[in-house]
Swiss-Prot record:
EC number: 6.1.1.3
Top-rank lineage group of the source organism: Bacteria
Gene Ontology molecular function: ATP binding; metal ion binding; threonine-tRNA ligase activity; tRNA binding
Chain intervals for the UniProt region annotation (Catalytic): 243-534
GO cellular component, one term: cytosol
Protein's UniProt keywords contain Membrane: no
Protein name in the entry: Threonine--tRNA ligase
Alphabetized CDD domains for the sequence: TGS_ThrRS, ThrRS_anticodon, ThrRS_core
Record organism: Haemophilus influenzae (strain PittEE)
Primary site of residence: cytoplasm
Cofactor list: Zn(2+)
Pfam families: HGTP_anticodon (PF03129), TGS (PF02824), tRNA-synt_2b (PF00587), tRNA_SAD (PF07973)
Family: Belongs to the class-II aminoacyl-tRNA synthetase family.
């Protein structure tokens, strides 16, 4: 007679083994109708699964994150059901969930078109609206293999042969005539799977191996109700408008090409933004008492073996050879900074030493993962390493946290998710060292009153880290900043200082990045601002234009005055109507447009408009120069009189 303990601590006793759904029915009809699955003793189980012994139970509904993930997984099966009806010869591979949705890899002898995708989606909805029950059956390994051999599913047979023990009892989920194999759980009825959208088709190698056959991957999104789906699709439309790749091309910021995959060709305007970010961070480095250094681009393999990178990071490192020596192009800056620290004797009185670098790094990321500025192979880190004593850890980490929030707020990012990533399976250093490192970061977070999420096993191989993820205007998270403790690397590279008792001790090293990759950060703010950069970051801060040729000399004088004031200003003297010029520069997102007609010349002024169409009236050139200089100096996010 199992006793079921519910989340509120109440208990229900049954005189026979009972399913998750039966417990929900015992609680109430409304809950039973909403039940998707259950969490039995912390493990997700299907609604039909039977509980035979005392257990804790949490009912999962569509309102739960787990429930939504199960809906998405079942929509992948629904996709399989529909495509199998429309294309009986298709071979089904895998259909997992991903963030916000799902996909299914299929093997079909022709390429799927948009018309095909529309037809599959239509059939999915028709099937879901029949509200059929999903039936789960446990079978032997051989029964599962016989089932898929009979159905002509070689990929399912390969999964059984290569990934599932012969003694296992796989779960087969029956969707009417369609059968799929999965760990589950899945929805008990397809009434839960009626709010979805198929999005695109892409190529994907079986098992992710380029030596295997290329399959077609059908992506979709699924939600608990119509409103959630509509809101998500609206966010996608807005994200597409803000895509940094499109905006980057429209504003002539940068380009990338096949001959240098994952490497950025910065154009003048994009490089202007890049340098402004560097200048801004440099002001903060001075404020927080950092020294700036520059390490070499590549170093001998021997050094990377000492650090552990060669053993733990080799797949992501570019290497080269010269004069019978093997070198690695640096994927990170920390080993070089330790070499700088090691030059000359250091005393405890010298610590902390805060060493910063805009370090050019390269990582051999898989080509399929590259994505505009967001995922590149060559990037610049606003990197720093702090060498300190154990007693200084909390104060130094606290200073890093303050600096992170200080910098992010300048860009308008105030919604920041904080995560503490702990020891991974593949790591260097002792458990005792990791205990101290993780406790040190947790103490600093507690001292600063920050709530945080623990990410088990997500730390780097040499230390735990705090991650700062920015939430943008579309609710997306971008992981940028990190503060990472490292008790291992300084010792591996023989870094020491003279302690107060004249003994030699190894310093603690704190890895710190705020923007992370500057390239990626530019991609993030391009999408956050939709290309409408604040005046201090805008490549061109103002354009001065004439109405007729008679104002050309005056325009040139205005441009010179503003340029001499340190502002980025251009003249537009083309023989075009002023309305045409304004429209063009508005599309280029230039913050201010200054129009000079005969009236403005007579008054010694300029007529000022913003890129959002606001007419600000007329100003003397000196007045406008002072206004814009103040906006740049204070790094304001809004333009003059902008809501």
């Amino acid at each position: 007679m199992p006793i079921i303990t519910l989340p509120d601590g109440s208990q229900r006793q049954f005189d026979h083994p009972v399913s998750v759904l039966e417990v929900a029915q015992d609680i109430g009809a409304g809950l039973a109708k909403a039940t998707i699955a259950g969490r039995v003793n912390g493990e997700r189980r299907d609604a039909c699964d039977v509980i035979e012994q005392d257990a804790t139970l949490e009912i999962i509904t569509a309102k739960d994150e787990d429930g939504l993930e199960i809906i998405r997984h079942s929509c992948a099966h629904l996709l399989g059901h529909a495509i199998k009806q429309l294309f009986p010869d298709v071979k089904m591979a895998i259909g997992p969930t991903i963030e916000n949705g799902f996909y299914y890899d299929v093997d079909l002898d022709r390429s799927l078109t948009q018309e095909d995708i529309d037809a599959i989606e239509k059939r999915m909805l028709e099937l879901a609206k029949t509200n059929y029950d999903v039936v789960k059956k446990r079978v032997t390994w051989q029964e599962a293999r016989d089932t898929f051999e009979k159905r002509g599913e070689p990929y399912k047979m390969a999964i059984l042969d290569e990934n599932i023990e012969r003694t296992a009892t796989p779960a087969l989920y029956h969707h009417l005539e369609y059968i799929d194999m999965c760990r589950g759980p899945h929805v008990p009825n397809m009434r839960f799977c009626q709010h979805f959208k198929l999005q695109k088709v892409a190529g994907a190698y079986w098992r992710g191996d380029s030596k295997n056959k290329m399959l077609q991957r059908i992506y979709g999104t699924a939600w608990a109700d119509k409103k959630q789906l509509a809101e998500y699709l609206t966010r996608l439309e807005e994200a597409a408008k803000r895509d940094h790749r499109k905006i980057g091309k429209a504003l002539d910021l940068y380009h990338m090409q096949e001959e240098a995959p994952g490497m950025v060709f910065w154009h003048n305007d994009g490089w202007t933004i890049f340098r402004e970010l560097e200048t801004f961070v440099r002001t903060k480095l001075k404020q927080y008492d950092y020294q700036e250094v520059k390490g070499p681009f590549m170093m001998d393999r021997v050094l990377w073996e000492k650090t552990g990178h060669w053993q733990n990071y080799a797949d992501l490192m570019f290497t080269t050879q010269s004069e019978n020596r093997e070198y690695a192009i640096k994927p990170m800056n920390c080993p070089g900074h330790v070499q700088i620290f090691n030059q000359g004797l250091k005393s405890y009185r010298d610590l902390p030493i805060r060493m910063a670098e805009f370090g050019s790094c390269h990582r051999n990321e898989p080509s399929g993962s590259l994505h505009g500025l967001m995922r590149v192979r060559g990037f610049t880190q606003d990197d720093a390493h702090i060498f300190c004593t154990e007693d200084q850890i909390e104060s130094e980490v606290t200073s890093c946290i303050k600096m992170v929030y200080d910098i992010y707020s300048t860009f308008g990012f105030t919604n920041i998710a904080v995560k503490l990533s702990t020891r991974p399976e593949n790591r260097i250093g002792s458990d005792e060292m990791w205990d101290r490192a993780e406790a040190g970061l947790a103490a600093a977070l507690a001292h600063n009153g920050l709530e945080y999420e623990i990410q088990e096993g997500e730390g780097a191989f040499y230390g735990p880290k705090i991650e700062f993820a920015l939430r943008d205007c579309l609710g997306r998270e971008w992981q940028c900043g990190t503060v990472q403790l490292d008790f291992a690397l300084p010792g591996r590279l023989d870094a020491t200082y003279v302690a107060e008792d004249n003994s030699r001790k190894t310093p603690v090293m704190i890895h710190r990045a705020i923007l992370g990759s500057i390239e990626r950060f530019i991609g993030i703010i391009t999408e956050e601002y939709a290309g409408f950069f604040p005046a201090w970051l805008a490549p061109t801060q103002a354009v001065v234009m004439n109405i007729t040729d008679s104002q050309s000399d005056y325009v040139q004088q205005v441009v010179k005055t503003l340029s001499d004031a340190g502002l980025r200003v251009k003249a537009d003297l083309r023989n075009e109507k002023v309305g045409f010029k304004i429209r063009e520069h508005t599309l280029r997102r230039v913050p201010y447009m200054l129009v000079c007609g005969d009236k403005e010349i007579a008054e010694g002024k300029v007529a000022v408009r913003t890129r959002k169409g606001a007419d600000l009236g007329t100003f003397t050139v000196e007045e406008f120069a002072e206004i814009l200089k103040n906006q740049v100096r204070s790094r304001e996010l809004k333009l003059l009189n902008e809501e």
